[in-house]
Amino acid sequence: GLLANLGHLEALLEGLGHPPGRVQVVAEEDPDALEALLWGPPPPPAAGSGDFLPMGGKRALLRLVADRLHADAPRPAEVVALPEGAPFGRVVVEAAGCTLCHACVGACPTGALEAHPERPMLRFTEDACVQCGLCRNTCPEKVIRLEPRLAFGPAAREAVILKEEEPARCVRCGKAFGTKSSIERIVARLAGAHWMFQDPEAVERLRMCDDCRVVSQ
């Protein structure tokens, strides 16, 4: 609602060095008191007049305004922490627990999280993240958390690698499939412990792609 959005703006201004109370909600029933407030001396502007064209959607306009406030800030900061629920922020992934299943990629509505087309990799673009939480709720390993904040500079608009692993390669044809660590975990769990994987040839099929497993049987 309105109060939540004003809270986000107040946090941004304070993070950029402005004193508290720059954003206020006037709830006054007395018309004379309201008139006195409206005609009173205004506070100094938080930023000079902008020289940008207000083009794009709501999020693009918010970014333009935030960049202008950052340029004229008393104490510019590269990153400003925001309250929970703010529509800007980053996704933090505990890399050790991530299996690169890419469930989060499929759930992300803005494309902030993306997979690499050729390698087991998870990439993230902070500027596209709206902190909806779908990735966190979808993650089967529960290794994703949200960090509401506003980052300035070109780094926020560039994709960063959150997790990358060596791909598993089929021992028969060399085709890449899955991640090497996940395949080896499966081998360690099943080899000798399951009746279907008592002989070395059956275990070796676990290290083959789907096509080669069919051919080798």
Go through each PLM region and give its residues.
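Ferredoxin-type iron-sulfur electron-transfer modules and their immediate structural context
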Residues: 2-121, 127-128, 138, 142-192, ...
